[in-house]
Amino acid sequence: MATTTAAAASGIFGIRIQDPRPGTGRVQARFGFSFGKKKPAPPPKKSRQVQDDGDRLVWFPGANPPEWLDGSMIGDRGFDPFGLGKPAEYLQYDFDGLDQNLAKNVAGDIIGIIQESSEIKPTPFQPYTEVFGIQRFRECELIHGRWAMLGTLGAIAVEALTGIAWQDAGKVELVEGSSYLGQPLPFSLTTLIWIEVLVVGYIEFQRNSELDPEKRIYPGGYFDPLGLAADPEKLDTLKLAEIKHSRLAMVAFLIFALQAAFTGKGPVSFLATFNN
C-alpha cells in the first residue's frame, strides 16, 4: 500500500524514491518541486587531473590541505582554515510510521548521512548544487579579485595624477562638484550614484541568469576582445595568472584601507614618506 501510494505521489510531486537498504522494505523520498520549464543542464566539463604527488604547491610549506581541496581547481593551494568549502552533510531519515491499524506509529530513525555530490547540477533558481559550496566561493573569489585589481590600480593612478588620495576623492566631489579628468560633468553626485546602481544592477541580473558555472566566471566574447583565451593550451595558464593577481590585489587593497585608517595617507604619499 505504502509503495503504491509513494509511486502515485512521485508522478505529482517529482519525488525521487530509492531503497537505502536493499531487502528491508524501507524507502527514502527527496522532494523537488519545480515551477516552470527547466533549462537543460550544460554538458559536464572535463575534470582536471588531481595533483596527488608530493610536489603539490600549498599556501604554507608543510601545510596539509583538507580533503575537499584536492588540487583539482586552478589555483588551489589548500587554504581553508575555517572549513568554509567543506561539503555539507545531511541526515537521512526513514519514513515515519503511517499504519492506521497500529495503536502507535513511531518516528523514522536516522539511517545514514547524505553528502551532496561534487557534480554541479544547475536549476532554474541557482547554478550550483550547494549555495555556499566551494564552486560558489570560487566565483566570489574571482569577482572580488577583479574588483580589487581595478580598485588598486585606480587608487594608485588617481593619486599619482592628481595628488588626491583615494579615500578623499569623494570629499572633493562633494565640494567642487562631479568631474572627470578635470572636466565638469552635468550630473550631481546623487545622480551618478543612481546611474551606477542601475547599470551595475542590470549587469549583475544578467550575469546571474546564466546557469553554466563556467560562463558565469569566464563569459568570454566582449570580455575577451584580444582573444587571449582562444588557445585551450594557454587557457589554464591565464586562469592561474588571474587568480594569483586577484589574491594579490585583494591583499593590497586591504593594506590600502588599513593605511588610510591609521595614517590618513594614500599608497603613493605613504610610499614617499617611507622613502624619506
From Swiss-Prot:
Residues binding chlorophyll a 3: 181, 242
Post-translational modification: Photoregulated by reversible phosphorylation of its threonine residues.
Transit peptide: 1-29
Binding, chlorophyll a 4: 245
One Pfam family recorded for the sequence: Chloroa_b-bind
Keyword Transmembrane part of the UniProt annotation: yes
Binding site for chlorophyll a 5: 259
Region (Disordered): 1-53
Residues binding chlorophyll a 1, per UniProt: 79, 141, 247
GO molecular function (one): metal ion binding
Record-annotated membrane-spanning stretches: 147-167, 185-205, 248-268
Topological category with respect to the lipid bilayer: Multi-pass membrane protein
Gene Ontology cellular component terms for the protein in this record: chloroplast; chloroplast thylakoid; chloroplast thylakoid membrane; Golgi apparatus; photosystem I; photosystem II; thylakoid
GO biological process terms on file: photosynthesis, light harvesting
Residues reported to bind chlorophyll b 1: 59
Regions of compositional bias (Basic residues) in chain numbering: 36-48
Alphabetically ordered keywords of this record: Chlorophyll, Chloroplast, Chromophore, Magnesium, Membrane, Metal-binding, Phosphoprotein, Photosynthesis, Photosystem I, Photosystem II, Plastid, Thylakoid, Transit peptide, Transmembrane, Transmembrane helix
UniProt: chlorophyll a 2 binding residues: 144
Record carries keyword Metal-binding: yes
Entry superkingdom: Eukaryota
Locations listed in the record: Plastid, Chloroplast thylakoid membrane
The protein's role, per its UniProt record: The light-harvesting complex (LHC) functions as a light receptor, it captures and delivers excitation energy to photosystems with which it is closely associated.
PANTHER family: CHLOROPHYLL A/B BINDING PROTEIN
Quaternary structure, from the entry: The LHC complex consists of chlorophyll a-b binding proteins.
Protein's UniProt name: Chlorophyll a-b binding protein CP29.3, chloroplastic
Encoding gene per record: LHCB4.3
